[in-house]
Amino acid sequence: MGKEPDNINMKKAITDPEILSTIAKLITKSISEDNIDKVAGPALGAVPIATAVSLESEIPLLMIRKEKKGYGTSKLIEGELNEGDDVIVVEDVTTTGGSLLKAIKAIQDNGGSVKRAFVVVDRQEGAIEAFDSEGVKLEPLITVDEFF
């Protein structure tokens, strides 16, 4: 195993159309047997991934803000989330999973159900276990050990 960086910068990957397309195809293939109503991603890093998956799968998109804005619609969730919607959540990188779990809680608090989440790179610092304890399966496309 090589030395892993303290910070994994996914911005280059999530702004590259070819890489985004590959990520979207992998996730879409994985959910093709599921009855998913919405694809969600927390701002900012996951929004391009969620958008790419939405376009590839033709499943409507939700964007989850970190906090409500004091202006405009002041919504935490942008997009139409209906009571009982099955939602998959995507993220670029997870460490402990805290920020993604916060986004999932926002979806659940607004009537949605989340059973699966996808992350491009898992840093292997407890996120999978944290998700398991919440009843959500976190599925990394790659782990930091595979990446570095």
Regions found by a protein language model. Give the residues of each.
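Short, glycine/charge-rich flexible loops or terminal/linker lids adjacent to PRPP-binding catalytic cores
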Residues: N7, T51-I88, T96-L101
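Active-site-facing substrate-recognition patch
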Residues: M1-N35
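PRPP-dependent phosphoribosyltransferase catalytic core
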Residues: K105-F148
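Short glycine-rich phosphate-binding loop at a beta-alpha junction
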Residues: D34-G45, F118
